[in-house]
Amino acid sequence: MALKHFNPTSPGQRGLVLIDRSELHKGRPEKKLVEGLTKSGGRGGNGRIAVRFRGGGAKRLYRLVDFKRRKQGVATVVRLEYDPNRTAFIALIKYQADGELAYILAPQRLKAGDEVVTADKVDVKPGNTSPLRTMPIGTIIHNVELKPAKGGQIARSAGAYAQLVGRDAGYAQIRLNSGELRMVLDTCLATVGAVSNPDHSNQNLGKAGRVRHMGRRPHVRGVAMNPVDHPHGGGEGRTSGGRNPVTPAGKPTKGAKTRVNKATDKFIIRSRHKAKKGR
């Protein structure tokens, strides 16, 4: 979908660039496929801040999106919808066999009236789902499973995709947007195509109020705080922080490695960090 550029008739309109969502459904979501969503304000189970600068925002209903796509058969796309809980658009589909409704991630070039298929072998058309072992090498995919039957975990945000680049000894090799090359079992499911709304990153919300509506609060710099609040805080007058950049907990930021799951290192053929250095 295209971008909408606004004329500078007010400070909040100046520079405003939004996604044109005129082709999406304008009514309420499917009632059977939504749940209430309680705001956390960025707090964890113990009531303490887990994620800084979160709170407020418009009320939302959580759409129950089917990331597993285990139901075999043909379904027809009823409509495309906006989902406030994710950057991508979602599609309401209706299975032809029994009339069951479900939400799925909408890939690019999918429109109302199209058919999507889940089967062991499918045509290479956006929205079709099959195991990686039956897909042609080079296929652009999204919503890729890391473990069979767990549901898609890779390439789910707006405009994201991965590419199937090879198969070997029961594993499929996929290249991610980050440059990482990794293996997953070839029995894992993936969906053909790239995720919808690729222009999401080109939006300019124009004013702070629109960001607040999304539940995000002002992001305060550590050097603007007091020493009790941040390792960079305090000092007479403006300071540079006086040390290498750290988090509020004092851990190095700006590129320090945080990955600790050595058990799955064997599935990563080429790290995303090495991929960046090689460019």
Curated annotation (Swiss-Prot):
Pfam entry (one): Ribosomal_L2_C
Cleavable signal peptide: none
SUPFAM superfamilies named among the record's database cross-references: Nucleic acid-binding proteins, Translation proteins SH3-like domain
Region Disordered: start-end pairs: 222-264
Gene Ontology cellular component annotations, sorted alphabetically: large ribosomal subunit
Single GO molecular function: transferase activity
Alphabetical UniProt keywords: Ribonucleoprotein, Ribosomal protein, RNA-binding, rRNA-binding
Single GO BP term: cytoplasmic translation
Known function: One of the primary rRNA binding proteins. Required for association of the 30S and 50S subunits to form the 70S ribosome, for tRNA binding and peptide bond formation. It has been suggested to have peptidyltransferase activity; this is somewhat controversial. Makes several contacts with the 16S rRNA in the 70S ribosome.
Subunit structure: Part of the 50S ribosomal subunit. Forms a bridge to the 30S subunit in the 70S ribosome.
Family per similarity comment: Belongs to the universal ribosomal protein uL2 family.
Protein name: Large ribosomal subunit protein uL2
Species: Caulobacter sp. (strain K31)
